[in-house]
Amino acid sequence: MIDIQGIKEALPHRYPMLLVDRVLEVSEDTIVAIKNVTINEPFFNGHFPQYPVMPGVLIMEALAQTAGVLELSKPENKGKLVFYAGMDKVKFKKQVVPGDQLVMTATFVKRRGTIAVVEAKAEVDGKLAASGTLTFAIGN
């Protein structure tokens, strides 16, 4: 398990863009983390005031950050950054609303040099909320 302090050591993101609260499981190529979604999230002020829904692009960002924690926690990547290089096969299946807990899983399926491909999914109450294939570049 990695707490918020460990996450902040791995990722450069800070409020309001830090979207990973805790890491539950870590292995060589897979990480499982959570994001507790509250009504206090700044994006709910405008998306949508009468019916708050977490923007899908921020769910994908949370998944990217989850993968980033795994990659940037490795000694050889200390102090580096992870940049989006692409997203494929992204699907949104369930709305994410205040009070939900996103359980995010990211599995690295391919690495070549500084490029990595990740299969990622976010679930709420065991139901798929979003999924996709994310491509990253690791750099300074």
UniProtKB/Swiss-Prot annotation:
EC assignment: 4.2.1.59
UniProtKB keywords: Cytoplasm, Lipid A biosynthesis, Lipid biosynthesis, Lipid metabolism, Lyase
Localization per Swiss-Prot or TrEMBL: Cytoplasm
Gene transcribed to yield this protein: fabZ
GO cellular component terms, semicolon-separated: cytoplasm; membrane
Protein name per the record: 3-hydroxyacyl-[acyl-carrier-protein] dehydratase FabZ
Signal peptide as annotated in the record: none
Source organism (scientific name): Streptococcus pneumoniae (strain Hungary19A-6)
InterPro entries in UniProt: FabA_FabZ, FabZ, HotDog_dom_sf
Purpose of the protein: Involved in unsaturated fatty acids biosynthesis. Catalyzes the dehydration of short chain beta-hydroxyacyl-ACPs and long chain saturated and unsaturated beta-hydroxyacyl-ACPs.
